[in-house]
Amino acid sequence: MNSVPNELTKSQELFGQISKISHSKISISELITLLDIHYSELFTKNPWMKKEVRKLASEFVENDPNHLLSKQDACHLIEAFVNVSITSPTLLTSVDPVLYQQLEASSTNDISTVFEDESSSLPIILHPKFSSMQVRTVTSPKDAFVSAFEENKFHFAATESFFEMAFSKIDSCLTSVQSTKKDSIKSRLVERYIQNEESVKRPDKSPFDTMTEATLQSSSDKSENFTKTLLSNVLSTILSVQVIFATVIALIAISVFCFLHTSSKTTSSKTRPS
């Protein structure tokens, strides 16, 4: 009775360790290592379990470019593993291999005489595809584990892997639709360009085309006249400024010349002998 709480405690510890991992995804080897730490005794008695866990985990990383497991998928795998361990503890830990040898050597009708009261050691696996009355009996611990693990896949679908695959398909569909739209738009633009080129090259013109050309010609003439007027105004302004500037410089030069001439006369008159 105490084994179930113990298994649940181990699974909770595993979930806690996975949640504390710094990176968002883990490798299958890391998952196997964590399981091996907590379930070393189970792996020792059933060495084939690691291979089966790795095989099932590889299905969850097919769509991942780095072949890594999301934390949620890793927790789902651990949950399925713990469910198998809890529901079939006798099968996975203490089944006598001699019984299985006898089973393989016996016919189907002799199964009840071989196992007698120990027939409960073999789990009965129900298939969702069949009715509740149609069951099958597993012939070995490995088959029981694999079957139970496969059955658990119906209960813990790889949600993240599934949604990633679905969204990638949706994204590819949208990309193809967008590319198709772009090609359609490009072809339409090319057709319009060709039509415009052909209409320009046509010698016969409609009255509307003539009016349009006249309007464009008048607007271009107006723009040219406006540009010429603006340039002439700017040039006249520049010239007037230059004239004023030259006049000021000339006045300053004349004033300086007169001042120097007057001062030189005064100096010469002072230096004459009396």
From Swiss-Prot:
Q: Which UniProt keywords apply?
A: Membrane, Transmembrane, Transmembrane helix
The transmembrane segments are 238-258
Q: Does the keyword Membrane apply?
A: yes
Kindly list the GO CC terms recorded for this protein. cytoplasm; meiotic spindle pole body; membrane
Membrane topology term reads: Single-pass membrane protein
Q: Name one GO biological process term.
A: meiotic spindle organization
The record's subcellular locations are: Membrane
Q: Does the keyword Transmembrane apply?
A: yes
Knockout phenotype, as recorded, reads:
Leads to meiotic defects.
Name the record gives this protein: Uncharacterized protein C1739.04c
